[in-house]
Amino acid sequence: MGRGVRVLLLLSLLHCAGGSEGRKTWRRRGQQPPPPPRTEAAPAAGQPVESFPLDFTAVEGNMDSFMAQVKSLAQSLYPCSAQQLNEDLRLHLLLNTSVTCNDGSPAGYYLKESRGSRRWLLFLEGGWYCFNRENCDSRYDTMRRLMSSRDWPRTRTGTGILSSQPEENPYWWNANMVFIPYCSSDVWSGASSKSEKNEYAFMGALIIQEVVRELLGRGLSGAKVLLLAGSSAGGTGVLLNVDRVAEQLEKLGYPAIQVRGLADSGWFLDNKQYRHTDCVDTITCAPTEAIRRGIRYWNGVVPERCRRQFQEGEEWNCFFGYKVYPTLRCPVFVVQWLFDEAQLTVDNVHLTGQPVQEGLRLYIQNLGRELRHTLKDVPASFAPACLSHEIIIRSHWTDVQVKGTSLPRALHCWDRSLHDSHKASKTPLKGCPVHLVDSCPWPHCNPSCPTVRDQFTGQEMNVAQFLMHMGFDMQTVAQPQGLEPSELLGMLSNGS
């Protein structure tokens, strides 16, 4: 066992033993306790105690082995604190009841505090949007939980990056976790209240601001890092709000809190639909037209630096990741499936279980190529060539890899590269990649992709079965790889 791990083990055992009531004092009988150090005041009762920092400088040459030992150590020590730890996130409705969901009920958040940590993770839920009275009425009838807090449960269990289990969440399990339910239907951009004129309130941007304000009184004021994360509409919400959160904290007197973003499945393209349809509802409306209508209906706000890039009335451009990202000051890690199911849906691509015709197959392949191109200048990105949607709060989020690196590992590398800095490092850490974009050109060519099931039979399909189901000619696929079709099929069937 390396010196770094031995030291960590000793400190952790002392920390674990010292956290129990009736603490033992290890000194000879009659010996007086040593005086407290003069350089730092002891923390007041009830205040969080900072975790021991790790010095990685001595173990850079064998970081993977070191982190494997640390993870094993964390898992073995976890039970010593888990007995007193409630894993559930508890609901808190906002004290400022003027900041509401669509129907006027108070917005809120779920919180699980971790008193030994100065890292805070705020997660924005996703769930599409509505952009006029008719489809908002329909949404209220069918998806009321996404427009009202009246039936929210008192607690919820964190999964994926919100999990408090180190085996499911190896690097963030001990952070302060905040889940912010999506009840504004405005991609977290709205700033209009309910009134006689407006049947619904759209206050997504204001909800985030108010949650941050309340959390300052619950320990966020002592944070070192705030990671604003989100999936789908929540991922787009991260891009729209991360700089605003940093500016808010600075104005309130907390400039030292490092604000970062993690946008999952919210990096959409304003591309041409496969089949153009009239804009009658959320699903069939082209992305550009839906957002153009929505931003007016919601009184939506976008990042100021992005807004200045476009003429008045063209602010909708800032909802698209590749346009807003270059204007952001805060570092953002982008997670995006190259063949995102929500993107395909708004592009009117519907995979019905029938073999895909050549025109559609080429459209899907080109979509992956376009998305890959938009990520070429995003230094921190994870883009598997999979047909899926959302990942970071899925329990299987540790399974998917790009070029041999998992998403939690990539996020950890990114975290290290940003240590004590608000700017991305120019030189990536050796053996710790953060720009991970698949280069293979068809859906599910990455064998670690989530399982696909046949829509009619419900049976799982391996990669080879899925590609043939999609209508891919295996001869055409195998030839550029220098393989025979039978060899490629064998490799894909075995998960190679």
Swiss-Prot record:
Superkingdom field: Eukaryota
Region described as Disordered: 21-46
EC numbers: 3.1.1.98
UniProt keyword rRNA-binding, yes or no: no
Protein name as annotated: Palmitoleoyl-protein carboxylesterase NOTUM
One Gene Ontology term from the biological process aspect of the record: bone development
Function, in words: Carboxylesterase that acts as a key negative regulator of the Wnt signaling pathway by specifically mediating depalmitoleoylation of WNT proteins. Serine palmitoleoylation of WNT proteins is required for efficient binding to frizzled receptors.
Residues bearing attached sugar chains per UniProt: N96
UniProt entry tagged with the keyword Phosphoprotein: yes
GO cellular component terms, semicolon-separated: endoplasmic reticulum lumen; extracellular region
Catalytic activity, reaction form: [Wnt protein]-O-(9Z)-hexadecenoyl-L-serine + H2O = [Wnt protein]-L-serine + (9Z)-hexadecenoate + H(+)
Signal peptide region: 1-19
Gene Ontology molecular function, alphabetical: palmitoleyl hydrolase activity; phospholipase C activity; protein-containing complex destabilizing activity
Tissues in which the protein is found: Rarely expressed in adult normal tissues.
Induction: Up-regulated in hepatocellular carcinoma (HCC) with high intracellular beta-catenin.
